[in-house]
Amino acid sequence: MYYRYMIVAILLLLLGVLGIVLNRGHLIIMLMSIELILLAASFLFLINSMITDTLIEQVFTIMVLTVAAAESSIGLAIMVAYYRIKGTIAIKSLNWLRG
């Protein structure tokens, strides 16, 4: 019964991976693809929680969503600061961040 939801979650996960592979030059699209991967993984945890009738996957999902929100906000803040300094957020211009 839950296999349809699992197929949707796996397709979302693959869509996120495909977004990272195809858009290597755009940071915002890569960040959105990483968020999609994390949300698909948490959706899989929730489906597994419904199948096995345990709560540990739900707790883990809340932790994954918290880390995803923190990662997204920090990543966007770094991108905004970088855009203010350089005027672009293309990956080709990120070589000055090496330290």
Curated annotation (Swiss-Prot):
Q: What is its main location?
A: mitochondrion
State the function annotated in the UniProt record: Core subunit of the mitochondrial membrane respiratory chain NADH dehydrogenase (Complex I) that is believed to belong to the minimal assembly required for catalysis. Complex I functions in the transfer of electrons from NADH to the respiratory chain. The immediate electron acceptor for the enzyme is believed to be ubiquinone.
- Is Coiled coil included in the keywords of this UniProt record? no
The protein depicted here goes by the name: NADH-ubiquinone oxidoreductase chain 4L
Q: Quote the InterPro entries the UniProt record gives.
A: NADH_UbQ_OxRdtase_chain4L/K, NUOK/Mnh_C1-like
Question: Gene for this protein?
Answer: ND4L
* Presence of keyword Membrane: yes
Name the family.
Belongs to the complex I subunit 4L family.
Q: Could you say which enzyme class this protein belongs to?
A: translocase
Its membrane topology, per UniProt? Multi-pass membrane protein
**A Pfam family:** Oxidored_q2
EC number of the protein: 7.1.1.2
What cellular component terms from Gene Ontology apply here?
Answer: mitochondrial membrane; NADH dehydrogenase complex
TM spans, by residue? 2-22, 27-47, 59-79
Q: Where is this protein found?
A: Mitochondrion membrane
- One term of GO molecular function: NADH dehydrogenase (ubiquinone) activity
Q: Which reaction does it catalyse?
A: a ubiquinone + NADH + 5 H(+)(in) = a ubiquinol + NAD(+) + 4 H(+)(out)
Q: Which UniProt keywords apply?
A: Electron transport, Membrane, Mitochondrion, NAD, Respiratory chain, Translocase, Transmembrane, Transmembrane helix, Transport, Ubiquinone
Q: Tell me, what is an example of a GO biological process annotation in this record? A: ATP synthesis coupled electron transport
